[in-house]
Amino acid sequence: MHEYSIVSALIEQCEQHALANHAAKITRVDIKLGVMSGVEPSLLQTAFDTFKLDSICKAAQLNIQIQPLVILCQDCQSESVLSERTVVCPTCQSYRTRVLDGEDMLLMQLEMEQDED
């Protein structure tokens, strides 16, 4: 299950941002997850809930925004937002398309709290 290694890297990235901003804890982690990223949202949530317990993210809520697939057709030049996992142009049925968005997982925002000293 590669979601564990993905969450491990995500938490490491969160810890780096917290350290750079002198934060005591992270309370919210917002990510954008593309439908073609190969990551299963429910498994990612489970892995996050497990790994966060021993980190600065232990009180954090993970918010996952699913990013639909966005393609550009090389034949008719139409840009399409697709909810299904296909690279066929819905306008002209061409397979000559290029993926513009929906393949990545990105850390979008962190909510952090400072020390109260």
From Swiss-Prot:
Organism: Shewanella baltica (strain OS185)
Keyword ATP-binding carried by entry: no
InterPro entries, per the entry: Hydgase_Ni_incorp_HypA/HybF_CS, HypA/HybF
GO function terms (MF aspect): nickel cation binding; zinc ion binding
GO biological process: protein maturation; protein modification process
Entry keywords, A to Z: Metal-binding, Nickel, Zinc
Record: residues binding Zn(2+): 73, 76, 89, 92
Recorded superkingdom: Bacteria
Entries under NCBIfam families matching the protein: hypA
Family designation: Belongs to the HypA/HybF family.
Protein name, entry field: Hydrogenase maturation factor HypA
Pfam families in the record: HypA
Lineage, top ranks: Bacteria, Pseudomonadati, Pseudomonadota, Gammaproteobacteria, Alteromonadales
Role noted for this protein: Involved in the maturation of [NiFe] hydrogenases. Required for nickel insertion into the metal center of the hydrogenase.
Binding of Ni(2+), residues: 2
Gene responsible for this protein: hypA
